[in-house]
Amino acid sequence: MRFAALETSTDWCSVALWVDGEIHSLERRVPNRHSEYALPMLESLTRNAGRLDAIAFGAGPGSFTGLRIACGLAQGLAFAHGLPVLGVSTLEATAEEAGAPRVVACLDARMREVYYAALEKRERRWHEVIPAQCVAPAEAPKPPGESWVGAGNGFAAYGDFGLRKVLPEVHPTAAAVARLAAPRLAAGEGVDAALAVPLYLRDKVALTLEEQRR
């Protein structure tokens, strides 16, 4: 199986190519400039790859603009080449990058909130112990038990949430998206491009003036 993966939900823009279990990837930190870099990076990576079987992308949550870029690019390529598309949770991709079996994934959602989930890896898949949510840091639920590792830039912005170990530098990558997408695509979970949608977790992009004064 050969497919491409995209991830543009944070300041990082990354692309990956999966070829029969081998991953090739490119990554660059380009805040607010993903639209300039994503397609050229992907074209550079896949130029000599031959026909792709699918497109995977980081569906969210994350930057609204970044999610639309990844989803739109995945849809455009899928429509053009008749390929299925698969969206992958950016919180799961963050957990995948953390390298631990029990991960609290926490991404800065701005507006004094975080995108947050507690995930446990069983049988090569991530399972939600605490469902993905957009929440104020002080209201984030604590995961049960011990041995949880925190991962994501939400910890850089708001502290360690009481966890013993946090990895604030960890972020979702296209390589992680590819690793998570591979078994799902093999199982036929890819969908028509028209059905691919971002996962926002909230429906507002800015605070009102009243909210800013609080």
PLM region spans:
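N-terminal beta-alpha supersecondary unit
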Residues: 1-64, 171
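Acyltransferase
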Residues: 165-214
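DPxDG-like acidic metal-binding loop motif
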Residues: 54-85
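Surface "functional belts" at beta-alpha junctions
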Residues: 23, 27-33, 83-173, 200, ...
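A residue-level signal for conserved active-site and pocket-lining positions in enzyme catalytic cores
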Residues: 62, 77, 150, 178, ...
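Active-site phosphate/pyrophosphate- and oxyanion-stabilizing loops and adjacent acidic/basic residues
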Residues: 43, 75, 92-93
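Glycine-rich phosphate-binding loop signature in dinucleotide/nucleotide-binding domains
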Residues: 48-50, 143-145, 185
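Stable alpha-helical structural segments in soluble proteins, enriched in small hydrophobic residues
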Residues: 45, 80, 98, 177-185
